[in-house]
Amino acid sequence: MIKITKGLDLPIAGMPLQQISPAPAVKRVALLGEEYVGMRPAMAVKEGDRVKKGQILFEDKKIPGVCFTAPASGIVSAIHRGERRVLQSVVIDIEGNDAVAFTRYAADALAELPRDTVQQQLLASGQWTALRTRPFSKTPLPGSTPAAIFVNAMDTNPLAAEPQPIILAERAAFDAGLTVLTRLTDGKVHVCQPSGGKLGGHPLGQVCFNQFSGPHPAGLPGTHIHFLEPVSLNKQVWHLNYQDAIAIGKLFLDGELYCERIIALGGPQVTSPRLVKTTLGASLEDLLAGELQEGENRVISGSVLSGARAHGPHAFLGRFHLQVSVVKEGREKELFGWVMPGKEKFSITRTTLGHFFKRKRFHFSTDTNGGERAMVPIGNYERVMPLDILPTILLRDLLAGDTDSAQALGCLELDEEDLALCTYVCPGKYEYGPALRSVLTRIEQEG
């Protein structure tokens, strides 16, 4: 077991009840184009077309063969584009249950499938896009082989669902998914679970189970990869979440695209925080109807630390997100707030009284309590960064755009979510995720 000592479990109110409850009916689903780093779509449908679940909606021009498929059957009601015609979302009004049929396999035959057969089924069904590379967090190139594949079977994000019961309820499909993944690599398939996890005993020796304990980010793929299979420009690994592993298993066992997801609804503004079963890409306007407290709220697809604001063309469940978080828009001004004790405010430093209430849950809002200012190195980053890097120096180089120094300090191992806590504790209010993405893009372009 690998024990993480540095990090932070954000004490936010609205922790979801870890029981699956009925969810409001969803009438629309969508694929969000901006979730896929560097993707340029070649559209295969237009508004008004009727599509089946699993039918191709668009293909990546940069990586021919990588297809993005419909998560439900129905009619394409909108194709939203932003500046410079960037694809924002392809929206489908759900109608019927028509689905594209794929090849089915017996469970005991999966371990003998040729790599090309597995790859072609994943590409044709759109499940290939569940995989992401490290470094760069992009969809893998067809035909490439990773040094290892990581399946994340734990989640330490604030307000997240507990993965173990969900996996155990679909254990046969999960094991089948792991077997399929072993056909894509000559290395290990690492299943990362929390301390005391009940997963284990896969018949293939290529699958190994690892345990991590400690505060967030102990449950992030970047943390697991750093300790088990560090990457470089010449070494690439892939990763995916546990529900995508289940979906891959069901694809090969049942011959149909599996798009059900169990997600957590949580946050201070959710009236009944709980787990719900919904559809990949579900409309969050439909899903949250009657679920929120009155007032101006911000809906976030994903974690409050690293998720995406869900509004307008983006008001749908993200491809890689297993939770929806809702907090209040912090527009109120507080007179002389900086001199008040701050009983209702949490701080990682001893600047507010709330720092000393270890069991208290706080009603966070979107208020950042100030704007950008100088980056002050007072040790905050070191408190929340468990990886073997120098965070203050790395973050400075990211802001300066120094690709050589950032690469030497380990930025290739990171994704935006790995720096989310650094953004949260930063006295200067800087957003380090976009700075990291800019540097990674330049490193990739310059080779």
Curated annotation (Swiss-Prot):
Alphabetized InterPro entries for the sequence: NqrA, NQRA_2nd, NqrA_C_domain, NQRA_N
HAMAP family: NqrA
Origin superkingdom: Bacteria
Protein name, UniProt field: Na(+)-translocating NADH-quinone reductase subunit A
Family membership: Belongs to the NqrA family.
Catalytic activity: a ubiquinone + n Na(+)(in) + NADH + H(+) = a ubiquinol + n Na(+)(out) + NAD(+)
Enzyme Commission code: 7.2.1.1
Database matches in Pfam families: NQRA_2nd, NQRA_N, NQRA_SLBB
Gene3D superfamilies: 2.40.50.100
Subunit annotation: Composed of six subunits; NqrA, NqrB, NqrC, NqrD, NqrE and NqrF.
Gene Ontology MF terms in the entry: oxidoreductase activity, acting on NAD(P)H, quinone or similar compound as acceptor
Record-annotated membrane-spanning stretches: none
GO terms under biological process: sodium ion transport
Function text: NQR complex catalyzes the reduction of ubiquinone-1 to ubiquinol by two successive reactions, coupled with the transport of Na(+) ions from the cytoplasm to the periplasm. NqrA to NqrE are probably involved in the second step, the conversion of ubisemiquinone to ubiquinol.
Record key words, sorted: Ion transport, NAD, Sodium, Sodium transport, Translocase, Transport, Ubiquinone
